[in-house]
Amino acid sequence: MNSLLMITACLALVGTVWAKEGYLVNHSTGCKYECYKLGDNDYCLRECKQQYGKGAGGYCYAFGCWCTHLYEQAVVWPLPKKTCNGK
């Protein structure tokens, strides 16, 4: 019984730690949201929260808004069968 409880607790913890992350994407163009102030960035944080909910985080990484703490079905860049501006 104790072993089952420990396994369940570990699986719940792993699910929490391994949340999805990725670049914020514009669904109409297929492009990443650009940013220029690397690191903590109010713009990226605001856009990630607006698109993915209050629990999401965001910062500027490699000149694109990187969102954290996303739900597993969240759509992030790159979009399947859609390239940025047809490139």
From Swiss-Prot:
Expressed by the venom gland. GO terms for biological process: defense response. Beta toxins bind voltage-independently at site-4 of sodium channels (Nav) and shift the voltage of activation toward more negative potentials thereby affecting sodium channel activation and promoting spontaneous and repetitive firing. This toxin had also a depressive action on the classical calcium current activated at high membrane potentials. This toxin is active on mammals. Belongs to the long (4 C-C) scorpion toxin superfamily. Sodium channel inhibitor family. Beta subfamily. Residues 1-19 form the signal peptide. Keywords: Amidation, Calcium channel impairing toxin, Disulfide bond, Ion channel impairing toxin, Neurotoxin, Secreted, Signal, Toxin, Voltage-gated sodium channel impairing toxin. The modification Asparagine amide is found at residue 85. PROSITE patterns: LCN_CSAB (PS51863). This is Toxin Cll2b. Disulfide bonds join 31-84, 35-60, 44-65, 48-67. It is found in: Secreted. Residues 20-85 form the LCN-type CS-alpha/beta domain. The keyword rRNA processing does not apply. Has the structural arrangement of an alpha-helix connected to antiparallel beta-sheets by disulfide bonds (CS-alpha/beta).
